[in-house]
Amino acid sequence: MGGLAMEEMPLSVLFEQARKIHLAASESGVDQDVVKKGCEMFQKCEDMIGKLALFSSNETKEDISTNNLKYLLVPYYLAELTEKIIQEDRIQIVKASYAKLKEFFSFCEAMELVPDEELEASSRGGSGAPADRRALKIARFKRQKAAEAKLLEIKERKERRGRSTKASALSTPVESGEDDIPDDDSEEEREAWLSSINLAICKAIDLLEMLKREEEMLSAIKERQLKDGEGGFSRDALDDRTKKAETWHRDAAARIQYSKPAQPITCATFAQDVLEGRASVSQGHEHKNQPLIFGPASIVGGPLSTERERMIAQVFQPSHRMPTMCIEDAGLTEMNIMNDWQEQTKKAIEEATTSWYNDKPLRRKEEDEEDDDEDEEAVMKARAFDDWKDDNPRGAGNKKLTPCG
Protein backbone atom coordinates (compact mmCIF):
# COMPACT_ATOMS: atom_id res chain seq x y z
CA MET A 1 0.00 0.00 0.00
CA GLY A 2 1.77 3.17 -1.22
CA GLY A 3 1.44 6.75 0.03
CA LEU A 4 -0.87 7.71 -2.83
CA ALA A 5 -3.28 4.91 -1.98
CA MET A 6 -3.28 6.00 1.66
CA GLU A 7 -4.09 9.58 0.65
CA GLU A 8 -7.02 8.42 -1.44
CA MET A 9 -8.53 6.13 1.22
CA PRO A 10 -11.52 7.44 3.21
CA LEU A 11 -11.24 7.79 6.97
CA SER A 12 -13.36 4.74 7.82
CA VAL A 13 -11.37 2.40 5.55
CA LEU A 14 -8.05 3.81 6.73
CA PHE A 15 -9.07 3.36 10.37
CA GLU A 16 -10.13 -0.26 9.84
CA GLN A 17 -6.88 -1.10 8.04
CA ALA A 18 -4.81 0.47 10.81
CA ARG A 19 -6.89 -1.26 13.51
CA LYS A 20 -6.21 -4.65 11.89
CA ILE A 21 -2.47 -3.95 12.14
CA HIS A 22 -2.89 -2.98 15.80
CA LEU A 23 -4.83 -6.18 16.50
CA ALA A 24 -2.18 -8.33 14.80
CA ALA A 25 0.62 -6.57 16.71
CA SER A 26 -1.20 -7.07 20.02
CA GLU A 27 -1.98 -10.76 19.54
CA SER A 28 1.34 -11.79 18.00
CA GLY A 29 4.60 -10.23 16.96
CA VAL A 30 4.71 -8.56 13.56
CA ASP A 31 7.49 -7.06 11.48
CA GLN A 32 8.78 -3.62 12.42
CA ASP A 33 7.92 -2.28 8.97
CA VAL A 34 4.29 -3.29 9.52
CA VAL A 35 4.27 -1.58 12.93
CA LYS A 36 5.68 1.62 11.46
CA LYS A 37 3.15 1.47 8.62
CA GLY A 38 0.35 1.18 11.20
CA CYS A 39 1.72 4.25 13.02
CA GLU A 40 1.73 6.21 9.77
CA MET A 41 -1.87 5.20 9.08
CA PHE A 42 -3.05 6.27 12.54
CA GLN A 43 -1.19 9.57 12.17
CA LYS A 44 -2.99 10.07 8.87
CA CYS A 45 -6.28 9.31 10.68
CA GLU A 46 -5.46 12.01 13.23
CA ASP A 47 -4.82 14.53 10.45
CA MET A 48 -8.11 13.69 8.73
CA ILE A 49 -10.05 13.88 12.04
CA GLY A 50 -8.58 17.33 12.67
CA LYS A 51 -9.41 18.54 9.16
CA LEU A 52 -12.97 17.22 9.38
CA ALA A 53 -13.42 18.69 12.90
CA LEU A 54 -15.29 15.62 14.11
CA PHE A 55 -14.92 16.52 17.79
CA SER A 56 -15.29 19.73 19.73
CA SER A 57 -14.05 20.70 23.19
CA ASN A 58 -17.57 21.58 24.40
CA GLU A 59 -19.05 18.18 23.46
CA THR A 60 -19.71 15.17 25.67
CA LYS A 61 -20.13 11.50 24.83
CA GLU A 62 -23.88 11.96 24.31
CA ASP A 63 -23.21 14.57 21.60
CA ILE A 64 -20.95 12.29 19.54
CA SER A 65 -22.60 10.11 16.94
CA THR A 66 -22.10 6.37 16.92
CA ASN A 67 -20.14 6.52 13.65
CA ASN A 68 -17.55 8.87 15.18
CA LEU A 69 -17.14 7.21 18.60
CA LYS A 70 -14.53 4.77 17.33
CA TYR A 71 -12.22 7.61 16.24
CA LEU A 72 -11.67 8.50 19.91
CA LEU A 73 -9.45 5.42 20.08
CA VAL A 74 -6.97 6.66 17.46
CA PRO A 75 -4.50 8.22 19.98
CA TYR A 76 -4.63 5.09 22.15
CA TYR A 77 -3.95 2.74 19.22
CA LEU A 78 -1.15 5.01 18.01
CA ALA A 79 0.44 5.03 21.50
CA GLU A 80 0.38 1.24 21.74
CA LEU A 81 1.89 0.78 18.29
CA THR A 82 4.54 3.43 18.96
CA GLU A 83 5.57 1.62 22.15
CA LYS A 84 6.27 -1.53 20.07
CA ILE A 85 8.80 0.22 17.80
CA ILE A 86 12.36 -1.01 18.40
CA GLN A 87 15.24 1.45 18.04
CA GLU A 88 18.42 2.38 19.89
CA ASP A 89 17.03 5.54 21.51
CA ARG A 90 14.32 3.91 23.61
CA ILE A 91 13.65 7.07 25.63
CA GLN A 92 12.26 8.90 22.60
CA ILE A 93 9.85 6.04 21.89
CA VAL A 94 8.69 5.98 25.53
CA LYS A 95 8.14 9.75 25.56
CA ALA A 96 6.18 9.70 22.29
CA SER A 97 3.94 6.86 23.47
CA TYR A 98 3.44 8.53 26.87
CA ALA A 99 2.41 11.81 25.19
CA LYS A 100 -0.21 10.08 23.03
CA LEU A 101 -1.65 8.25 26.03
CA LYS A 102 -1.91 11.51 27.96
CA GLU A 103 -3.67 13.06 24.96
CA PHE A 104 -6.15 10.17 24.86
CA PHE A 105 -6.75 10.36 28.62
CA SER A 106 -7.30 14.13 28.53
CA PHE A 107 -9.75 13.91 25.64
CA CYS A 108 -11.72 11.13 27.39
CA GLU A 109 -11.77 13.27 30.53
CA ALA A 110 -13.25 16.15 28.54
CA MET A 111 -15.86 13.78 27.12
CA GLU A 112 -16.79 12.65 30.68
CA LEU A 113 -15.69 9.07 30.01
CA VAL A 114 -13.14 8.73 32.83
CA PRO A 115 -14.46 7.56 36.25
CA ASP A 116 -14.30 10.04 39.13
CA GLU A 117 -11.93 7.92 41.24
CA GLU A 118 -9.42 7.81 38.37
CA LEU A 119 -9.63 11.60 38.03
CA GLU A 120 -8.95 12.03 41.74
CA ALA A 121 -5.97 9.68 41.58
CA SER A 122 -4.63 11.51 38.52
CA SER A 123 -4.91 14.87 40.31
CA ARG A 124 -2.90 13.48 43.26
CA GLY A 125 -0.15 12.43 40.87
CA GLY A 126 -0.05 8.79 41.95
CA SER A 127 0.60 9.59 45.62
CA GLY A 128 -1.58 8.19 48.35
CA ALA A 129 -1.87 5.39 50.84
CA PRO A 130 -0.96 1.89 49.61
CA ALA A 131 -4.41 0.63 50.58
CA ASP A 132 -6.07 3.33 48.45
CA ARG A 133 -3.86 2.52 45.46
CA ARG A 134 -4.61 -1.16 45.85
CA ALA A 135 -8.37 -0.54 46.03
CA LEU A 136 -8.11 1.67 42.93
CA LYS A 137 -6.29 -1.05 40.98
CA ILE A 138 -8.87 -3.64 42.03
CA ALA A 139 -11.73 -1.40 40.89
CA ARG A 140 -9.91 -0.74 37.59
CA PHE A 141 -9.39 -4.47 37.06
CA LYS A 142 -13.09 -5.12 37.66
CA ARG A 143 -14.07 -2.42 35.14
CA GLN A 144 -11.68 -3.94 32.61
CA LYS A 145 -13.15 -7.43 33.05
CA ALA A 146 -16.69 -6.05 32.82
CA ALA A 147 -15.85 -4.26 29.55
CA GLU A 148 -14.27 -7.40 28.09
CA ALA A 149 -17.32 -9.47 29.08
CA LYS A 150 -19.64 -6.89 27.53
CA LEU A 151 -17.74 -6.89 24.25
CA LEU A 152 -17.81 -10.69 24.15
CA GLU A 153 -21.54 -10.72 24.82
CA ILE A 154 -22.22 -8.22 22.02
CA LYS A 155 -20.06 -10.23 19.63
CA GLU A 156 -21.92 -13.46 20.40
CA ARG A 157 -25.26 -11.67 20.07
CA LYS A 158 -24.28 -10.38 16.62
CA GLU A 159 -23.18 -13.84 15.53
CA ARG A 160 -26.47 -15.40 16.65
CA ARG A 161 -28.47 -12.68 14.93
CA GLY A 162 -26.43 -13.14 11.77
CA ARG A 163 -27.08 -16.87 11.72
CA SER A 164 -30.80 -16.40 12.33
CA THR A 165 -31.00 -13.72 9.64
CA LYS A 166 -29.25 -15.97 7.15
CA ALA A 167 -31.57 -18.84 7.98
CA SER A 168 -34.68 -16.69 7.67
CA ALA A 169 -33.44 -15.24 4.37
CA LEU A 170 -33.17 -18.74 2.96
CA SER A 171 -36.70 -19.64 4.07
CA THR A 172 -38.71 -16.42 3.59
CA PRO A 173 -38.03 -13.13 1.80
CA VAL A 174 -36.88 -10.27 4.02
CA GLU A 175 -39.49 -7.56 4.53
CA SER A 176 -38.69 -3.92 5.08
CA GLY A 177 -38.90 -2.90 8.70
CA GLU A 178 -36.67 -2.81 11.74
CA ASP A 179 -34.06 -5.04 10.09
CA ASP A 180 -33.33 -2.26 7.58
CA ILE A 181 -31.93 0.04 10.31
CA PRO A 182 -28.15 0.44 9.86
CA ASP A 183 -26.03 -1.22 12.52
CA ASP A 184 -23.82 1.90 12.91
CA ASP A 185 -26.71 3.89 14.41
CA SER A 186 -27.98 1.08 16.60
CA GLU A 187 -27.71 1.12 20.36
CA GLU A 188 -25.79 -2.12 20.29
CA GLU A 189 -23.04 -0.63 18.11
CA ARG A 190 -22.81 2.41 20.34
CA GLU A 191 -22.63 0.24 23.44
CA ALA A 192 -19.83 -1.79 21.88
CA TRP A 193 -17.69 1.26 21.10
CA LEU A 194 -18.28 2.75 24.55
CA SER A 195 -17.18 -0.53 26.11
CA SER A 196 -14.07 -0.51 23.89
CA ILE A 197 -13.27 3.03 25.05
CA ASN A 198 -13.72 2.07 28.71
CA LEU A 199 -11.43 -0.91 28.20
CA ALA A 200 -8.85 1.31 26.51
CA ILE A 201 -8.98 3.79 29.41
CA CYS A 202 -8.21 1.02 31.93
CA LYS A 203 -5.30 -0.25 29.85
CA ALA A 204 -4.03 3.27 29.15
CA ILE A 205 -3.76 4.09 32.87
CA ASP A 206 -1.69 0.96 33.52
CA LEU A 207 0.46 1.65 30.46
CA LEU A 208 1.03 5.24 31.60
CA GLU A 209 2.39 4.03 34.94
CA MET A 210 4.62 1.47 33.24
CA LEU A 211 6.02 3.97 30.71
CA LYS A 212 6.66 6.51 33.46
CA ARG A 213 8.72 4.02 35.46
CA GLU A 214 10.58 2.91 32.32
CA GLU A 215 11.43 6.50 31.43
CA GLU A 216 12.77 7.13 34.93
CA MET A 217 14.93 4.00 34.79
CA LEU A 218 16.31 4.81 31.33
CA SER A 219 17.05 8.40 32.33
CA ALA A 220 18.88 7.24 35.47
CA ILE A 221 20.96 4.77 33.46
CA LYS A 222 21.82 7.41 30.88
CA GLU A 223 22.83 9.94 33.55
CA ARG A 224 25.04 7.37 35.25
CA GLN A 225 26.73 6.48 31.98
CA LEU A 226 27.38 10.14 31.24
CA LYS A 227 28.67 10.68 34.78
CA ASP A 228 31.09 7.74 34.50
CA GLY A 229 32.23 8.94 31.10
CA GLU A 230 30.83 5.94 29.29
CA GLY A 231 28.54 6.15 26.36
CA GLY A 232 27.38 2.61 26.84
CA PHE A 233 28.67 -0.49 25.13
CA SER A 234 29.94 0.37 21.71
CA ARG A 235 29.00 -1.71 18.73
CA ASP A 236 32.69 -2.53 18.07
CA ALA A 237 33.16 -3.89 21.60
CA LEU A 238 30.08 -6.07 21.30
CA ASP A 239 31.22 -7.36 17.90
CA ASP A 240 34.66 -8.12 19.32
CA ARG A 241 33.14 -10.12 22.19
CA THR A 242 30.94 -12.02 19.76
CA LYS A 243 33.91 -12.90 17.54
CA LYS A 244 35.94 -14.14 20.51
CA ALA A 245 33.08 -16.35 21.70
CA GLU A 246 32.54 -17.78 18.21
CA THR A 247 36.28 -18.49 17.84
CA TRP A 248 36.42 -20.26 21.20
CA HIS A 249 33.44 -22.48 20.34
CA ARG A 250 34.86 -23.22 16.90
CA ASP A 251 38.23 -24.28 18.35
CA ALA A 252 36.52 -26.41 21.00
CA ALA A 253 34.47 -28.16 18.31
CA ALA A 254 37.64 -28.84 16.31
CA ARG A 255 39.49 -30.26 19.34
CA ILE A 256 36.65 -32.57 20.28
CA GLN A 257 37.07 -34.46 17.00
CA TYR A 258 40.58 -35.63 17.98
CA SER A 259 40.25 -36.01 21.74
CA LYS A 260 37.82 -38.46 23.25
CA PRO A 261 37.22 -37.75 26.92
CA ALA A 262 37.17 -40.65 29.35
CA GLN A 263 33.75 -41.77 30.44
CA PRO A 264 33.23 -40.63 34.03
CA ILE A 265 32.48 -43.30 36.61
CA THR A 266 29.44 -42.28 38.55
CA CYS A 267 27.29 -44.03 41.10
CA ALA A 268 24.31 -43.93 38.77
CA THR A 269 26.11 -45.76 35.97
CA PHE A 270 27.65 -48.29 38.38
CA ALA A 271 24.26 -49.06 39.94
CA GLN A 272 22.75 -49.43 36.46
CA ASP A 273 25.53 -51.88 35.52
CA VAL A 274 24.87 -53.90 38.69
CA LEU A 275 21.12 -54.05 38.03
CA GLU A 276 21.61 -55.10 34.40
CA GLY A 277 24.23 -57.74 35.25
CA ARG A 278 27.29 -56.06 33.67
CA ALA A 279 29.01 -55.62 37.05
CA SER A 280 29.02 -57.32 40.42
CA VAL A 281 28.18 -55.70 43.72
CA SER A 282 31.43 -56.99 45.16
CA GLN A 283 33.42 -54.88 42.71
CA GLY A 284 34.57 -51.66 44.29
CA HIS A 285 33.67 -48.54 42.44
CA GLU A 286 35.72 -45.38 42.29
CA HIS A 287 33.07 -42.85 43.21
CA LYS A 288 33.75 -42.27 46.89
CA ASN A 289 32.40 -39.36 48.88
CA GLN A 290 34.68 -38.75 51.81
CA PRO A 291 33.08 -37.28 54.94
CA LEU A 292 33.84 -33.63 55.56
CA ILE A 293 36.44 -32.75 58.17
CA PHE A 294 35.92 -29.63 60.25
CA GLY A 295 38.10 -27.52 62.51
CA PRO A 296 41.75 -28.28 63.32
CA ALA A 297 41.21 -31.90 62.33
CA SER A 298 41.37 -30.76 58.72
CA ILE A 299 45.01 -29.61 59.09
CA VAL A 300 46.28 -32.63 61.00
CA GLY A 301 47.88 -34.95 58.51
CA GLY A 302 48.04 -38.70 59.02
CA PRO A 303 46.85 -40.67 62.03
CA LEU A 304 46.43 -39.03 65.41
CA SER A 305 49.42 -40.32 67.36
CA THR A 306 49.49 -38.24 70.52
CA GLU A 307 46.86 -37.19 73.01
CA ARG A 308 47.53 -33.56 72.12
CA GLU A 309 46.68 -34.17 68.46
CA ARG A 310 43.49 -35.99 69.44
CA MET A 311 42.43 -33.09 71.67
CA ILE A 312 43.26 -30.56 68.94
CA ALA A 313 41.23 -32.54 66.40
CA GLN A 314 38.18 -32.49 68.66
CA VAL A 315 37.98 -28.68 68.73
CA PHE A 316 35.21 -26.97 66.73
CA GLN A 317 33.61 -30.23 65.66
CA PRO A 318 29.92 -30.52 64.71
CA SER A 319 27.46 -31.15 67.52
CA HIS A 320 26.00 -34.16 65.71
CA ARG A 321 27.57 -37.40 64.58
CA MET A 322 28.93 -37.31 61.07
CA PRO A 323 28.08 -40.09 58.60
CA THR A 324 30.57 -42.91 58.29
CA MET A 325 29.76 -43.65 54.66
CA CYS A 326 28.21 -41.92 51.69
CA ILE A 327 24.75 -42.65 50.34
CA GLU A 328 26.17 -44.68 47.45
CA ASP A 329 28.15 -46.97 49.79
CA ALA A 330 25.10 -47.44 51.99
CA GLY A 331 23.08 -48.42 48.93
CA LEU A 332 25.70 -50.95 47.87
CA THR A 333 25.76 -52.40 51.40
CA GLU A 334 21.99 -52.75 51.34
CA MET A 335 22.26 -54.45 47.97
CA ASN A 336 24.80 -56.92 49.38
CA ILE A 337 22.51 -57.71 52.31
CA MET A 338 19.59 -58.22 49.95
CA ASN A 339 21.58 -60.57 47.71
CA ASP A 340 22.74 -62.63 50.73
CA TRP A 341 19.18 -62.85 52.01
CA GLN A 342 17.93 -63.98 48.62
CA GLU A 343 20.63 -66.66 48.40
CA GLN A 344 19.85 -67.96 51.90
CA THR A 345 16.13 -68.03 51.17
CA LYS A 346 16.70 -69.90 47.93
CA LYS A 347 18.97 -72.43 49.66
CA ALA A 348 16.46 -73.00 52.47
CA ILE A 349 13.66 -73.57 49.96
CA GLU A 350 15.78 -76.09 48.04
CA GLU A 351 16.73 -77.96 51.23
CA ALA A 352 13.13 -78.09 52.40
CA THR A 353 11.96 -79.39 49.05
CA THR A 354 14.69 -82.06 48.88
CA SER A 355 14.14 -83.29 52.44
CA TRP A 356 10.41 -83.53 51.87
CA TYR A 357 10.90 -85.81 48.86
CA ASN A 358 13.54 -87.93 50.63
CA ASP A 359 11.51 -88.47 53.83
CA LYS A 360 8.28 -89.40 52.06
CA PRO A 361 8.86 -93.26 51.92
CA LEU A 362 10.01 -93.34 55.55
CA ARG A 363 6.93 -91.47 56.69
CA ARG A 364 4.73 -93.84 54.70
CA LYS A 365 6.40 -96.91 56.36
CA GLU A 366 5.94 -95.45 59.81
CA GLU A 367 2.30 -94.74 59.07
CA ASP A 368 1.78 -98.37 57.96
CA GLU A 369 3.40 -99.70 61.15
CA GLU A 370 1.21 -97.46 63.26
CA ASP A 371 -1.87 -98.78 61.43
CA ASP A 372 -0.79 -102.42 62.10
CA ASP A 373 -0.32 -101.74 65.81
CA GLU A 374 -3.72 -100.17 66.01
CA ASP A 375 -5.30 -103.22 64.28
CA GLU A 376 -3.66 -105.70 66.73
CA GLU A 377 -4.84 -103.70 69.73
CA ALA A 378 -8.38 -103.68 68.39
CA VAL A 379 -8.33 -107.50 67.85
CA MET A 380 -7.02 -108.20 71.35
CA LYS A 381 -9.61 -105.92 72.86
CA ALA A 382 -12.42 -107.63 70.93
CA ARG A 383 -11.21 -111.13 72.01
CA ALA A 384 -11.07 -110.10 75.68
CA PHE A 385 -14.60 -108.77 75.47
CA ASP A 386 -15.83 -112.04 73.94
CA ASP A 387 -14.22 -114.06 76.75
CA TRP A 388 -15.86 -111.87 79.35
CA LYS A 389 -19.26 -112.34 77.73
CA ASP A 390 -18.75 -116.13 77.85
CA ASP A 391 -17.94 -116.00 81.56
CA ASN A 392 -20.82 -113.69 82.35
CA PRO A 393 -24.02 -114.74 80.49
CA ARG A 394 -26.85 -112.32 80.12
CA GLY A 395 -28.91 -111.92 83.33
CA ALA A 396 -26.67 -114.09 85.53
CA GLY A 397 -26.23 -111.49 88.20
CA ASN A 398 -29.94 -110.82 88.76
CA LYS A 399 -31.16 -114.28 89.98
CA LYS A 400 -31.31 -113.36 93.69
CA LEU A 401 -33.47 -110.35 92.97
CA THR A 402 -36.33 -112.29 91.35
CA PRO A 403 -39.41 -113.22 93.57
CA CYS A 404 -39.23 -116.92 92.68
CA GLY A 405 -35.49 -117.09 93.17
UniProtKB/Swiss-Prot annotation:
Induction remark: By chilling. By abscisic acid (ABA).
Organism: Arabidopsis thaliana (Mouse-ear cress)
Keywords from the UniProt entry: Phosphoprotein
An MF annotation (GO) of this entry: kinase binding
Pfam family, one: TAP42
Listed Acidic residues bias regions: 176-189, 367-377
Biased composition (Polar residues): 165-174
Membrane spanning stretches: none
Region (Disordered): 159-189, 352-405
Disruption phenotype: RNAi plants show the formation of spontaneous disease-like nectrotic lesions leading to premature cell death. The defective plants also display a strong reduction in protein synthesis, the induction of autophagy and nitrogen mobilization.
Function in brief: Involved in the positive regulation of the TOR signaling pathway. Acts as a negative regulator of PP2A catalytic activity. Plays a positive role in the ABA-regulated inhibition of germination, probably throught its interaction with ABI5.
Gene Ontology CC annotations of this record: cytosol
Post-translational modification: Phosphorylated by TOR kinase in vitro.
Subunit structure: Interacts with the 36 kDa catalytic subunit (subunit C) of PP2A. Interacts with PP2A1 and PP2A2. Interacts with PP2A3, PPX1 and FYPP1. Interacts with FYPP3 and ABI5. Interacts with ATPK1/S6K1 and ATPK2/S6K2. Interacts with TIP41L.
Regions of compositional bias (Basic and acidic residues) in chain numbering: 378-393
UniProt protein name: PP2A regulatory subunit TAP46
UniProt record similarity statement: Belongs to the IGBP1/TAP42 family.
Tissue: Ubiquitous. Highly expressed in seed, and particularly in the embryo.
One annotated GO biological process: TOR signaling
Other information: Plants over-expressing TAP46 exhibit an increased abscisic acid (ABA) sensitivity in seed germination and a reduced PP2A activity. Over-expression of TAP46 also leads to the stimulation of the overall plant growth and the increased nitrogen-assimilating activities.
